Amino acid sequence: QLREIAKLVHEAGKELIVAVNALMHQDMMDRIKPFLDFLEEIKTDYITVGDAGVFYVVNRDGYSFKTIYDASTMVTSSRQINFWGQKAGASEAVLAREIPSAELFKMPEILEIPAEVLVYGASVIHHSKRPLLQNYYNFTHIDDEKTRKRDLFLAEPSDPESHYSIFEDNHGTHIFANNDLDLMTKLTELVEHGFTHWKLEGLYTPGQNFVEIAKLFIQARSLIQEGKFSHDQAFLLDEEVRKLHPKNRFLDTGFYDYDPDMVK
């Protein structure tokens, strides 16, 4: 499948980014080189990397693809990003989702490489290598699915309205923010402050709906480049995003408008 995807991407004149951003145990590191060789073979343009061991192998063996530093739940510092750019050769970095705009807009003054910002989709807030769901099932003698398609949620005891998506795979347990992110109405501000690398996360937005949402953000980007992205245009495109978003999931602007003192 990845080989076919690479073919389609390159035929369309686009660049292929492949996620290699797991935190690697030694057994995974022992198997990483054949996978990196395959990515080189299919002419991957970028890989996302969250483990120092992968950076080491990529640089040691001289692979041609570029690297994007992606330990996104932990990346909140410009100096941290610059370190990976300088020492590991990262060409870009993925920012954490928990950075208020007041702090975010200070970062370009220090950043030496581009930073990617999530503008739509589920926001990961915690990752554990442990099989937390399976451990819970074992303790409670429950036999149930752990995958994303099971659509499981966590709720805080003090807040029954909370609903943190959770699933488990062979990389561990993944937990996501209460609501999904939608920064359609904030795109002009992001561009004005130098954030032009955007990510759309389609993990919980299946099929064609995600494709249509991506097209709306592409339309917004084109309007911004032409100087035609008005407040009304942003509102109209935002309404279209909300129509296409899964009905059982809510949207907000995440930490974007938070007071930085509330996050520390």
Q: What is each residue range found by the language model?
A:
Residues 81-101:
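Internal, well-ordered domain-core segments that constitute the primary functional module
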